[in-house]
Amino acid sequence: MSQIVDDAGAEAEHDAGAEAGHEPADAADQRRLGARLHALRDDRRWSLTELAEESGVSRAMINRVERGVSSPTATILGRLSGAFGLTISQLLDGSHETHAHAETEPADPDDATGVQRAATADHWTDPDTGYRRRPLSSAEFPVDVTEVRLPAGRAVTYPASAYAFLRHCIWVVDGALELVVGGVPTTLGAGDRIELGDPAKVTYRNDGETECRYVVVVARGARGRE
């Protein structure tokens, strides 16, 4: 099991703000995510302390997320999804299950054709950086395809535990992305792509003056994560 990470250098400074929590941008979605997290923990018969040890996220923060009173940052989502052996997309997609199958909602004719309308697509925004994720594939599709928008001057870091998947490819659509993998920086411009290798801590950084938009493709393995 991993130790709770909250006291190491720059990462600790970032996590200290993350652990303080943020008010949810969308209370309904936040409650669904909290319910999803609690259900996953219950399925594994984990206490709050056990999940905290597995993920490196404090018990207090996990409790706030489960109760729907705090919105986790991208870093915290990466740690939680890694603890459960899920991609971030799988963790977030699960938070919409109740919404998607609510009996009170009329059937969507696009469902039968596999069409996803941009106007009605789900998305998740990191309350700490404004980093925004939109799933481009369904939960049933054999790979995770996600569009990410990273604002200028912002950075998001995921721990190595969030990268124990089969294959992971990043393709930059607009702007420039500074990718730091295991301490090694690489700059990607529009049209560039990179495939990640062995699990390592990864920082996505936008040092430019405009938003960076990129697509992440994850092929799920036995313990696929993102």
Role assignments for model-derived ranges:
Residues 118-160, 167, 217-218:
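A short glycine-rich, His/Asp/Glu-containing loop-to-beta-strand
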Residues 35-52:
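Short basic helix-loop element that most often maps to the first helix and adjoining turn
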